[in-house]
Amino acid sequence: MKSYFFFILSNILIDNFILVKFLGLCPFIGASNQIKQAFGISFATSFVVVVSTVLLWFVNFFILLPFDLVYLRIIVYMLIISFGVQLIEIILRGTSPILYRILGIFLPLITTNCAVLAIPLFSLYLNHTFLESILYAVSASFGFTLVMVIFSSIRERILLSDVPLAFQGSPIVLITVSLISIVFMGFKGLVRI
């Protein structure tokens, strides 16, 4: 139990996909202007990551490995992720039109988010069990959400601040991201697995 706690904590704070592995930067920079947008893209991405990790674990161990089709892994993963995103979009459109309107613009973008493909692949390459794969996906998604919300709240304050002309736009965004990354590097000595 203790090792699972450290495993989850490590994936959220120390091995954060945005700040350490530099995955998922497109929605991080593009959809973090407001906290509402950050929560929307984070929720949708987290849901797709967890569901696709579960599906892809089963596909890998019950179809690709037994039939020696490992060379098709990335193509199959991309197809399943695309199918999952479309399925979620159809379900949301029919069951919750309000949630669909909030997340509607973000759902197609999730398919191209590299973190959605990377999390199941890293889980596979790290030889995680089924439970560890689920915990890895949930904790990585929570880390993604945490950083998105922190950054979007800081970014909202930056928009209200008087930023020098040379730093307006992308420069201040990149400086802020680098400072947040340095803060998260401080957690490096917190957990040793």
Curated annotation (Swiss-Prot):
Record GO cellular component, one term: plasma membrane
Could you say which EC number(s) this protein's record lists? 7.-.-.-
Membrane topology according to the record: Multi-pass membrane protein
Name the major location: membrane
Tell me where in or outside the cell this protein is found.
Answer: Cell inner membrane
The signal sequence is none
Task: Give the superkingdom in one word.
Answer: Bacteria
> Which UniProt keywords are listed?
Cell inner membrane, Cell membrane, Electron transport, Membrane, Translocase, Transmembrane, Transmembrane helix, Transport
Give the EC class as a word: translocase
Ranges annotated as spanning the membrane = 5-25, 47-67, 72-92, 102-122, 134-154, 171-191
**UniProt GO BP:** electron transport chain
Q: What does this protein do?
A: Part of a membrane-bound complex that couples electron transfer with translocation of ions across the membrane.
State the similarity comment. Belongs to the NqrDE/RnfAE family.
Q: How does it assemble?
A: The complex is composed of six subunits: RnfA, RnfB, RnfC, RnfD, RnfE and RnfG.
Q: What name does UniProt use for this protein?
A: Ion-translocating oxidoreductase complex subunit A
Question: From which source organism is this entry?
Answer: Buchnera aphidicola subsp. Schizaphis graminum (strain Sg)
The gene from which this protein is expressed is rnfA
